[in-house]
Amino acid sequence: MALPFVLLMALVVLNCKSICSLGCDLPQTHSLSNRRTLMIMAQMGRISPFSCLKDRHDFGFPQEEFDGNQFQKAQAISVLHEMIQQTFNLFSTKDSSATWDETLLDKFYTELYQQLNDLEACMMQEVGVEDTPLMNVDSILTVRKYFQRITLYLTEKKYSPCAWEVVRAEIMRSFSLSANLQERLRRKE
C-alpha cells in the first residue's frame, strides 16, 4: 500500500515541478512548441498551394491583437490560448480528419494540447500578478470572429481540399505572427 502512495506522490511532485518550473517563462518554451507545430503543419500539405490560388481568401487576421505593445502578459497569454484552442477545434472536426494524414494530425493535436496546457498553467500563475483582467474580452472575441470567418469559408467551399489548403496556410501564417508576440513577451521579462 505504501509503495503505490509513494509513486503517486512522486508523480504529483514531478508534475508540479514541470508546471511550476515554467515560472511563466512561457514564451521561450512555447516558441519551441510553436516551431514544432509549424513544421508539422508544413508536412500536412498534400496539394500544391499554387493549384489553389483561385481559392485564396482574406480572413482578416486580427493583426492588431498580436501587434499591440499595450498588452499585459496575462492578456497576451489569453489571446494566444484562444488562438490555439480555436485551431484545435477547427482541426478536430470530422471534415478535417478526412482531409489530413492521421499520423500528422495526431502529432498536431499533441503539440496543440501541450501548448494549451502550458498556457493554462501560465494563466493561472498570472492571476493576481497583474492588475489588468486576465481575459481581454474584446481581443478574445476578435480571435473567435476570425475563426468563425474561417469556418464559414470552409462551409461555403464544401470543405474542398483547396479550401483546407488555404486554411492550413492561413493558420501557419497566424502561428508565425503569434511568434512575434511571444518574442516581445520574452523581451519584456
From Swiss-Prot:
Its main location: secreted. It is found in: Secreted. GO terms for biological process: adaptive immune response; B cell activation involved in immune response; cellular response to virus; defense response to virus; humoral immune response; natural killer cell activation involved in immune response; response to exogenous dsRNA; T cell activation involved in immune response. GO terms for cellular component: extracellular region; extracellular space. Residues 1-21 form the signal peptide. Keywords: Antiviral defense, Cytokine, Disulfide bond, Secreted, Signal. Coiled coil: none annotated. Gene3D superfamilies: 1.20.1250.10. PROSITE patterns: INTERFERON_A_B_D (PS00252). It comes from the Eukaryota. InterPro entries: 4_helix_cytokine-like_core (IPR009079), Interferon_alpha/beta/delta (IPR000471). One of its GO terms (molecular function) is type I interferon receptor binding. Produced by macrophages, IFN-alpha have antiviral activities. Interferon stimulates the production of two enzymes: a protein kinase and an oligoadenylate synthetase. This is Interferon alpha-5. It comes from Homo sapiens (Human).
